Amino acid sequence: MNLTITKEQLLNGLQAVQNVVSSRTTLPILSNVLVRAENNRLEFTATDLDVTVACSVEATVKKGGATTIPVKKLFSITRELSSTEIDLEVDEKNVCSIRSGSSFYKINGLAAEEFPPINAFKDDKKVTVAQEKLKAMMKKTSFAISTDEARYVLNGIFMSLKEHKMTIVATDGRRLALTDEEVDISDKSQGEFIIPAKAVNELNRLLSDKGDVTIRYAENQAEFSLKDDKGFSVVIVTKLIEGNYPNYRQVIPAEAKERVSLPREEFLHALKRAEIMTSEKANSVKLAFGKNNLAITANSPEVGEARESIAVNYKGKEMAIAFNPKYMIDPLNALSNDEVFIELIDELSPGVLKINGPFLYVVMPMRLS
C-alpha cells in the first residue's frame, strides 16, 4: 500500500472513527483502525464489536491495499506533524511508514484479515432523511436515555418508522422526551427498534447540518450512512437492543388543568442558578406559579437558600410543584425556541414541557417540602 494524503483529510478520517475504539479491550486488533486504500479513496474502519464506524476520505493512491494500525498512535502522530502532506507506505509485514516533511515514523500494524468483518445490508428496510432533521431530533431526546444497566431496554433511544412519521423517544423512568417528524417511509420499511446509547453518541457527534442520512435496519442491526456535499462519507453500524420498549403513550398525562408560557433562556438560567444551592439530600427546586409570575426557590439546610423570580404568561390559579432541577435544565438546554410551555394538573402529577413544534417532555415531580 502506498499513498499520499493531506494532514486535514487524514485527521478527518481518524477523528470520525477513533471514538468507538475501547482503551480497555483484551483483543489487540480492536485497538487498531482498518485502513483500506483504493480508487483514490482511503477508508478507515473501527469497531468495539457492538458499534462500527467507517469513514472514507480522498487520497492519491499509488498502490492499493489494506492493513490495521493502532489508531491512537496514528492519530497522535498525524496531529503533531507540521507538514500538510503525508506519505503512507505499508510493507508485506504490515509495518506502516509515515513520511512528512523532515519527519519519519514506523508503526507496527496487524493483518487486515484479522479485523472483524462488517455485515452488508440489503435495501429492504430503509428510509432517508436530512441529517439536520435527525440531528435535531436526537438532541431533543437523547439526554433522557437511562444509564441504569438493570433496565437494558431503556439504555438507548426508541425509533419508530410508521405512517409517514419518524418518532424518537427516550426515557429513564423518571422523565420522557419525545419528538416526531414527517418522513417518506415505504410500506415495507415500516417498523421500530432501539438504538443503544453508544451509537446515539456517535450519531450526535457525526451528524452534520448538510446532506442526508440513509437508515437501514434488520432484525438485530441498523446502519446509518451519512454523506455531505464535500464528498465526506461516514457509515455507523450498530447492534440493536433486544426487547420490547415500554408503552410510552400511557405515561403522557391527559389534558392539563393549567398552562404557563415561559421565556426559555431566562427560565433556564434561573434554574441553573437555583441548582447551585441544592445538595444531595435536598436536590429539588420549587416552582410557585402566580398571576404572570414564577417564583423559583431552592432550600438546603447544609448549603443555603436561593430565590428567583421571572415574569411569565399565566392566568391560572396559584400552584406549586417541585422538580429535580437537572430534569428541567436538560430539555431547556437541548431546545432553541424562545418560548416554552409547561402544562400541569396538580403538584403530584407529572408536568409536561412543550414548544410550538413536534416535541413533548414528561417529568415526574418531587415531594414538596
Residue ranges and their predicted role:
Residues M1-S369:
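Structural preference for solvent-exposed beta-strand-turn elements
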